[in-house]
Amino acid sequence: MKVGITFSAFDLLHAGHIGMLREAAENCDYLIVGLQTDPTIDRPDTKNKPVQTLVERYAQLNALKFIDEIVPYQTEQDLLDILELFQIDVRFLGEEYKEDEFSGKDICRKRGGLRKRVVEAENR
């Protein structure tokens, strides 16, 4: 079974998020979504506090039938711990990260099989 994972705060869930998540789900057998509780914990100068509560964002993601599991996390270290703990085959990133560094890149390289896949967010 091919397990995929993606991470975000998913605040104000929109068609771009849904398109990216659907595309990720179509490219794995089991999709885990890491839901960041508050991006300002690690990056207060570059990120905004979520408008929606964690419960609201979780409920919206949970309504998407192609998501198999939602794992809330707080910090970038938590994200790294999740990548180390779970048996992940592919890490999905939105197209905006195509040329950027991303958290956990070293883990992806170290584990060999875990690779990054950039998915295009289409408004379907």
Regions found by a protein language model. Name each.
Residues 1-124:
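Nucleotidyltransferase catalytic core that binds NTPs
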